[in-house]
Structure formats: C-alpha cells, structure tokens
Curated annotation (Swiss-Prot):
Catalyzes the reversible interconversion of serine and glycine with tetrahydrofolate (THF) serving as the one-carbon carrier. This reaction serves as the major source of one-carbon groups required for the biosynthesis of purines, thymidylate, methionine, and other important biomolecules. Also exhibits THF-independent aldolase activity toward beta-hydroxyamino acids, producing glycine and aldehydes, via a retro-aldol mechanism. One of its GO terms (molecular function) is glycine hydroxymethyltransferase activity. One of its GO terms (biological process) is tetrahydrofolate interconversion. This is Serine hydroxymethyltransferase. The record marks 225 as: Plays an important role in substrate specificity. It comes from Helicobacter pylori (strain P12). The gene is glyA. Keywords: Amino-acid biosynthesis, Cytoplasm, One-carbon metabolism, Pyridoxal phosphate, Transferase.
C-alpha cells in the first residue's frame, strides 16, 4: 500500500513503521494504554481535521458546520446511551482537560479539593501540588490503609476536617474497585459535590464489570481510550442539567477553543464499538486475564499492593527488594514486556525511581490473549525479576515472547 507520508516525509514514516513493529512484537502492559479500533483511526485521519467548529451543535460561531453538528450530536447521544446518563460533553481534548473543566465549572479559585494521594494511586489532576489543580485550588488528599485498600472511615474523617467543595473518587493506579455509594455518603455528609474519575475503568463500567458511578456521582469524567479502546480524548457526563450547562461553558469558552472534530467523530465510532455485545466479552476477558496474572505472580511469592486486583491493573511492591521500580521497568523492557515504574503506598524512593511497577491487561486482551498466555507472561515476569541483572536471560525471554506476540498481530498496516 502506498502512503503520501512515505513520499513526503520518509523520516517520520520510517519512525511510525518502527513503532508499528514495536507494538506488534512487544507485550504492551502499561495499564493506561490500549490498541484502538482501526475504524477509530480512520475517523481520526479523516478530512474532519480541517473543520473549525467553535461552540456546540446548532450554536456555532463558524459557518459550514451542518455536517459536524450531526457528528457531534451522534457522539453525544451514543455517550449518553453507553453510560446511561442524561448529559454528555464530548469536546474535552483529554482526561486532564475534562477534570480541569469540571473544577473550572464548579469551583472558585482556592476552593478545596479532596482527592486520592498521588503515591496511593491518585492522578495529578486530583490535587497534586505540582499540577494546576494543586496550585489553583486548596488540595487535600486521602490514601489507603496498610492493606492497600481505601479506608472509607478515614476518608470521612478527613472530609469532615477539610470540608471540601468537591471530592474526587478515581485513580490512575489503584487495583481495587471504587465504592461510589460510600463516597456519595461521605460527600453528602460534608456538603461536597462528588466527581467520579473513571478514566481507567470506563470500559469495565459500561460492560458491567465494575460498579457504575451513577446515580452516586454528581459529575463523571473519563478518557475515551484506556479500557474503552477509543481515541485519545476526554469525556464529561452528568444527570444534572444545571451542572451540564456549567460544564459546557467551562469547556468552551472557559478552557478550550475549537473542538477537534476528527477526534469527536472517532469518539462516536468508539462508542458504537463499546455498545456491541462483543465489547462486554472483551471487558470480561480483561478482568479474568488480570486475575490469572496476579495468581501466577503470587504463586511465585511476589508481593502485590492490596494482595491482588479487582480490575484491569495490578501493582507490584518492591519496598523490601534491592531493586527499584525503575530497575524492573528496564529489565522487563529488555525482555519485550512494556510496563511502567510506579509509586506505591509507603513509597521510600523518588518518583523517578519508585518501589513498584504498574501492569495492565487491557492491551494484550485486545490482541486476543487469554489465560494461557497470561500465565506464561506471569512466569516470565517472575523469572526476569528473580534474576534482574541477567541480560542474556532478558534477551532469551524477549525472543520467546516475540514469537508469542506474532501469533496475536495487532494491525496489518501502520497507518489507517
């Protein structure tokens, strides 16, 4: 197949092809990454990238929006159907943009946010001091207990002391299910709004493999990739008409200008895929595969944060190991397994080194790998970590896993 890009910019084309090979030959196990649908990539690469459309359907500041109005309206309706809610904003460029828009809509400068501590699994936008949310608002955090679980009684005590305007329940590295009902009870107790950030588990939520944030959360944010397998982007949902109006104003003109219509079309395509029965089977596989991996690692005496997992990810704990999360990340990468170093509860090393790694099952499940493959992968991870400086072992395992990966091809071309 001939590509314009190959003729006009061979340098970039060759690098894309190099990444294409890496994605096919490596085992992608970063919990926030996934393989999107080819149809989504076709929409992303369409002529819709040419169209500016500031505003919302039938309320644009530019002409010529008749077609993109239909596209955005379709994306909104599909999102509402998928998440069983009354209002959806599909314009947020990312999950971080979605969260920032929620704060912009519902808070005043220096209002109080209560979110999960970064080292316990929270996200930068949940109030981390280095982020905009930690600078523009007063941020406070809750963590996990010694077992690695959220202690809801402790969250209540902190909320009663802090009296936040908004409580964020959600995570970027927490291996257990969120109890939205308990969080709502805490929010009601202190008069706070509740934001459910389901960026990581949205695909599980819509497939009934994780508790649903509605009717408990006042507003819900998400990404459209990760477990949803859609394009990179953000999404905001609510059942409250007043909140919905504030969200729309906070996105445009509050925090963004023109929406990315090619991305919104791709979101619509992704939502249609999510509504299919096959997607429920996929989400079930994501969870069951992670259970297999956790079991394999525990049988090899590896320590997991919270002792296991209830979703699509797990965290390995190296607090009592001579090697760090960074060491493990590099060693596994050399063996063809892509993970990421991650801070864990009780962290003693710097965020650039860490005492843990985060591992996810969504991407390999999208390739069709099942229990057999995940058991093999668990054993290989164990072998590498138990002899972490053995470079020849890493290279040997890399070839073994490359052969396995080739049995489950991702895509048959690098550009759609």
């Amino acid at each position: 197949m001939a590509y314009f890009l190959e003729q006009t910019d061979s340098e970039i084309f060759e690098l894309i092809f190099e990444e294409y090979k890496r994605q096919n030959e490596h085992l992608e196990m970063i919990a926030s990454e996934n393989y999107t649908f080819p149809s989504v990539m076709e929409a992303m690469g369409s002529i819709l990238t040419n169209k500016y459309a500031e505003g919302y359907p039938n309320k644009r500041y530019y002409g010529g929006c008749e077609v993109v109005d239909k596209i955005e309206s379709l994306a909104i309706e599909r999102a509402k159907k998928l998440f069983n809610c009354q209002f959806a904003n599909v314009q947020a460029h990312s999950g971080s943009q979605a969260n920032n828009a929620v704060y912009h809509a519902l808070l005043k400068p220096y209002d109080k946010i209560l979110g999960m501590d970064l080292s316990c699994g929270g996200h930068l936008t949940h109030g981390a001091k280095v982020s905009l949310t930690g600078k523009h608002y007063q941020s406070f955090s809750y963590g996990v207990n010694l077992d690695g679980y959220i202690d809801y009684e402790e969250v209540l005590k902190i909320a009663q002391s802090v009296k936040p305007e908004i409580i964020v329940c959600g995570f970027s590295a927490y291996p257990r299910e969120i109890d939205f009902k308990k969080f709502r009870e805490i929010a009601d107790e202190v008069g706070a709004l509740l934001l459910g950030d389901i960026a990581h588990v949205a695909g599980l939520v819509v497939a009934n493999e994780h508790a649903h944030p509605f009717p408990h959360c006042h507003v819900v944010s998400s990404t459209t990739h990760k477990t949803l397998r859609g394009p990179r982007g953000g999404l905001i949902l609510t059942n409250d008409e007043e909140i919905a109006a504030k969200i729309d104003k906070a996105i445009f003109p509050g925090t963004q200008g023109g929406p990315l219509m090619h991305a919104i079309a791709a979101k619509a395509v992704g939502f249609k895929e999510n509504l299919k029965p096959e997607f429920k089977a996929y989400a079930k596989l994501v969870k069951s595969n992670m259970q297999v991996l956790a079991k394999a690692l525990k049988e090899k005496n590896h320590k997991l944060v919270s002792g296991g997992t209830s979703n699509h990810l797990l965290l390995m704990d190296f607090l009592d190991k001579p090697y760090s999360g960074k060491d493990a990340d590099i060693a596994l990468g050399n063996a063809g397994i892509t993970v990421n170093k991650n801070t864990i509860p009780g962290e003693t090393r710097s965020p650039f080194v860490t005492s843990g790694i985060r591992i996810g099952s969504a991407a390999l499940s999208a390739r069709g790998m099942g229990a057999k493959e995940f058991e093999i992968i668990g054993n290989k991870i164990s072998d590498i970590l138990n002899d972490i400086n053995n470079v020849s072992l890493q290279l040997h395992v890399k070839e073994e896993l490359k052969a396995m990966a080739n049995q489950f091809p991702v895509y048959h071309q690098p550009i759609f």
